[in-house]
UniProtKB/Swiss-Prot annotation:
The keyword Nucleotide-binding applies. HAMAP family: Leu_tRNA_synth_B. The gene is leuS. GO terms for molecular function: aminoacyl-tRNA deacylase activity; ATP binding; leucine-tRNA ligase activity. This is Leucine--tRNA ligase. Transmembrane segments: none annotated. Its main location: cytoplasm. A motif ('KMSKS' region) lies at residues 619-623. It is an enzyme of class 6 (ligase). It is found in: Cytoplasm. Coiled coil: none annotated. One of its GO terms (cellular component) is cytosol. It catalyses: tRNA(Leu) + L-leucine + ATP = L-leucyl-tRNA(Leu) + AMP + diphosphate. One of its GO terms (biological process) is leucyl-tRNA aminoacylation.
Length: 860
């Protein structure tokens, strides 16, 4: 064994060994308990970032630990390879998305291997290959036949100059990111999957997910947004149709003073025929971004349509306005407004001078003060005719019942959740397998024409999708009849909704899933990824699992038992102000800093001499140029050091502050472990440990070893507090470094301790542990070694610490044998000088003794 720890030499050797031995490849084995550990698959952007490294290190630690417990552990990896960034990169680099993507996959695969992650590479998949997306296409056609897929028009962001659809992130300040043209909202036909048919199950089954974070479950509950309310129909004077609205607050209905409809509503369109102001407003609404978050913060605007609706209970005429905060695709495209008791309605009414009628009393029973804002709390009704004096629940039921009896109301359960629009007007995605025949019939692509393959050898112009630009691509024939293929592609959330299941049978050619393999491995035991995926990906992931279950492919209700959302990785951020007043962000690697005595940054400059402004720690990002390249760190310190720092610096679900000083600390610790093993093995063979012949000091050290095993096992296995597990191993190492190594039993005990330390560190730092295990054992492979088990007998304390008080004040702490009697404890306490001086010349009136813990002598 060489004296110096040289990670650059040992890590590549160990990685080669894993590759050659196929150490982490697994197959179904009914004789073993399975464990499926999965990290969210990466988008092949070109390089790994520290967020990836943190996510995958957590997964690898858990997988390696479970493997050492003797379980059959599946830990696969793949590539979420379709998506918009590849199109932009292809245009920029004058290539096609496919070669750019495959090059990135090859590069990032090497980076993953360099970090020593124990993946089953035989199951690697890329979602952009026909071998993968063919089954998604087939499944979509089956959902269509079941009535779970339909086509309808829906609003998109449209660039009139480029004649193309834009994703929300391609709209910057209301303009096209490419040509700066004002973006419009346009209705185009799109494909939808009926996720709303599963809304109740998606909501109720959240209660089964005991090991998912409450924050994620709450976000999903709110997103699904189940509400109970009443659908109310209004007659409209001089208009052929009625207006229908939905409300969750029928108790406030007597305070409804106007209705609002979407700009695209037929009533608004009709009114605009003779109203130029309204027509201009409808035109303006076409330029409103579709994203719901934008809707919430934008200025609320509207125009009176001139139509009057009739309040069903009071008979009063109330105005109907067109408003930009009402969307056609949400509900009926019309809402009732109660400005006295809804803040948005209040602001709109105040702006346009509309009537505000209070109908709920304040908490103290007085009339509410509506001079500044609406009263949104529930309460007792007034100003509401026959319903006066009713509380919220009674009023809800009474008004709902009356509207129902009159035939103008109906109790309804509503969902905020909308059906999943899966059409994208992009090129780099899986083609949607639908065709339109010459006679206009729309039908799924027949099985014998699947997969519908996306051509990869294309030229990108950055505007139109190559499969839309090439009229020949869409042409096909079905049963001898000419037909046109759909040129939209799937939302890339489709691919990431079922990849976890395909990992169980990636080579299977008879269908989407091999049920036998899928049911052996599924559900996933732990799924690791960022909380930013809480509602989109993680909801579609759950939905797809239920679709596959109902197709008979899997027999579980939920895809993952446990979800672990890792925290973000933060780093220092610095900038200087350029000549034009713009911020130039400088990488923390290039910042020369001065710190105060507490280690805080007080001054910074870069190599060019710019005075830098330090903005504190923020999420590693391209925009702030504060990302740290994992590859540079691995080359400098080794993969094991980077992994150890990632797991030690912070609890897994909290933010992690990148500090190179902390990385250096992790590296020093591994050098200490190496040095101790080197010094131990240099002394030659070790005798067997004779537990019965140990001295008190040796027993105490052995007790520490086994207590550490117990703590680390609990911290990794049950609590998943990996940082405290590492801290416990470090503490033990400090004790081992000071332990005597001269005697035969000293060395035998050190051998037992080091074998335990190396196994406990193995999930975190597998390369160094692989090497040290071979040095300590002389044979075998740590990847097949079992996790150390704490010896209960070794942990039994021979002695205990007793606190000695005189008149309730602590005067000493004494060590006594565990089986000492009260008399023996009193005698031992009396020998303590600090106790004896308080007993001198006084009488002990009372003795309070808590065995093994406390002795209180009451004197007077």
């Amino acid at each position: 064994m060489q004296e110096q720890y040289r990670p650059e030499e040992i890590e590549s050797k160990v990685q080669l060994h894993w590759d050659e031995k196929r150490t982490f490849e697994v197959t179904e084995d009914e004789s073993k308990e399975k464990y499926y550990c999965l990290s969210m698959l990466p988008y092949p952007s070109g390089r790994l970032h520290m967020g990836h490294v943190r996510n995958y290190t957590i997964g690898d630690v858990i997988a390696r630990y479970q493997r050492m417990l003797g379980k059959n552990v599946l830990q696969p990896i793949g590539w979420d390879a379709f998506g918009l960034p590849a199109e932009g990169a292809a245009v920029k680099n004058n290539t096609a998305p496919a070669p750019w993507t495959y090059d990135n996959i090859a590069y990032m695969k090497n980076q993953l291997k360099m970090l020593g992650f124990g993946y089953d590479w035989s199951r690697e998949l890329a979602t952009c290959t026909p071998e993968y997306y063919r089954w998604e296409q087939k499944f979509f056609t089956e959902l269509y036949k079941k009535g779970l897929v339909y086509k309808k028009t829906s609003a998109v962001n449209w660039c009139p100059n480029d004649q193309t659809v834009l994703a929300n992130e391609q709209v910057i300040d209301g303009c096209c990111w490419r040509c700066d043209t004002k973006v419009e909202r346009k209705e185009i036909p799109q494909w939808f999957i009926k996720i709303t048919a599963y809304a109740d199950e998606l909501l109720n089954d959240l209660d089964k997910l005991d090991h998912w974070p409450d924050t994620v479950k709450t976000m999903q509950r709110n997103w699904i947004g189940r509400s109970e309310g009443v659908e109310i129909t209004f007659n409209v004077n001089d208009y052929d149709n009625t207006l229908t609205v939905y409300t969750t607050r029928p108790d406030t209905f007597m305070g409804c003073t106007y209705l609002a409809v979407a700009a695209g509503h037929p009533l608004a369109q009709k009114a605009a025929e003779n109203n130029p102001e309204l027509a201009a407003f409808i035109d303006e609404c076409r330029n409103t971004k579709v994203a719901e978050a934008e809707m919430a913060t934008m200025e609320k605007k509207g125009v009176d349509t001139g139509f009057k609706a009739v309040h069903p209970l009071t008979g009063e005429e109330i105005p109907v306005w067109a408003a930009n905060f009402v969307l056609m695709e949400y509900g009926t495209g019309a809402v009732m407004a109660v400005p006295g008791h809804d803040q948005r309605d209040y602001e709109f009414a105040s702006k346009y001078g509309l009537n505000i009628k209070p109908v709920i009393l304040a908490a103290d029973g007085s009339e509410p003060d509506l001079s500044q804002q609406a009263l949104t709390e529930k309460g007792v009704l007034f100003n509401s005719g026959e319903f006066n004096g009713l509380d919220h629940e009674a009023a809800f039921n009474a008004i709902a019942d009356k509207l129902t009896a009159m035939g103008v109301g109906e109790r309804k359960v509503n969902y905020r959740l909308r059906d999943w629009g899966v059409s994208r007007q992009r090129y780099w995605g899986a083609p949607i397998p639908m065709v339109t025949l010459e006679d206009g019939t729309v039908m799924p692509t027949p099985d014998d024409q699947l997969p519908v393959i996306l051509p990869e050898d294309v030229v990108m112009d950055g505007i139109t999708s190559p499969i839309k630009a090439d009229p020949e691509w869409a042409k096909t024939t079905i049963n001898g009849m000419p037909a046109l293929r759909e040129t939209d592609t799937f939302d890339t959330f489709m691919e990431s909704s079922w990849y976890y299941a395909r990992y169980t049978c990636p080579q299977y050619k008879e269908g989407m899933l091999d049920s036998e393999a899928a049911n052996y491995w599924l559900p996933v035991d732990i799924y690791i990824g960022g909380i930013e995926h809480a509602i989109m990906h993680l909801l579609y992931f759950r939905f797809f699992h239920k679709l596959m279950r109902d197709a008979g492919m899997v027999n579980s209700d939920e895809p993952a038992k446990q979800l672990l959302c890792q925290g973000m990785v933060l780093a220092d951020a610095f900038y200087y102000v350029g000549e034009n007043g713009e911020r130039n962000w400088v990488s923390p690697v290039d910042a020369i800093v001065e710190r105060d005595e507490k280690g805080r940054i007080v001054k910074a400059k870069d190599a060019a001499g710019h005075e830098l402004v330090y903005t504190g720690m923020s999420k590693m990002s391209k925009s702030k140029n504060n990302g740290i390249d994992p590859q540079v760190m691995v080359e400098r310190y080794g993969a094991d050091t980077v992994r150890l720092f990632m797991m030690f610096a912070s609890p897994a679900d909290m933010t992690l502050e990148w500090q190179e000083s902390g990385v250096e600390g992790a590296n020093r610790f591994l050098k200490r472990v190496w040095k101790l093993v080197y010094e131990h093995t240099a002394k030659g063979d070790v005798a067997a440990l004779n537990v019965d012949a140990l001295t008190e000091d040796q027993k105490a050290l052995r007790r520490d070893v086994h207590k550490t095993i117990a703590k680390v096992t609990d911290d990794i296995g049950r609590r998943q507090t990996f940082n405290t597990a590492i801290a416990a191993i470090m503490e033990l190492m400090n004790k081992l470094a000071k332990a005597p190594t001269d005697g035969e039993q000293d060395r035998a005990l050190m051998q037992e301790a080091l074998l335990a330390v190396v196994r406990m560190l193995n999930p975190f730092t597998p390369h160094i542990c692989f090497t040290l295990w071979q040095e300590l054992k002389g044979e075998g492979d740590i990847d097949n070694a079992p996790w150390p088990v704490a010896d209960e007998k070794a942990m039994v304390e021979d002695s205990t610490l007793v606190v000695v008080q005189v008149n309730g004040k602590v005067r000493a702490k004494i060590t006594v044998p565990v089986d000492a009697t009260e008399e023996q404890v009193r005698e031992r306490a009396g020998q303590e000088h600090l106790v004896a001086k308080y007993l001198d010349g006084v009488t002990v009136r009372k003795v309070i003794y808590v065995p093994g813990k406390l002795l209180n002598l009451v004197v007077g």
